[in-house]
């Protein structure tokens, strides 16, 4: 799948490029050139676990850049904690997103990003440096997600005296 800048749809890039670049040079945001209809892609979605669903969705965006085995590795590494679906009412279920290592829903995204970027920097002779500025749980999720990822250094900036006690922990 190709991605374009929200400020210019004319230049298409692949997923790896968009991921590693972060932002287009025209200060837009990268968007997929098409949005797959995952309801049609995943028959019986209500009977699948989160890793199976994640694989199908990730594959629809990553298959041009990664082998299926690499996508499976990314998903298995990124979602290595419980994420139970809890029945609330008849026909109403909720996916609990707070069971990750930092208890934040951002664990899913940060770990997926770190494992995907790790695949991109393998066999690269340069380190990737990532600068993150946050006042909340993004920092802990990113720090945990990128911990011990070879070839990637993460610097997290927090505003002085603007972070809650629970988020510091």
Regions found by a protein language model. Give the residues of each.
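PLP-dependent amino-acid enzyme catalytic core
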Residues: 1-169
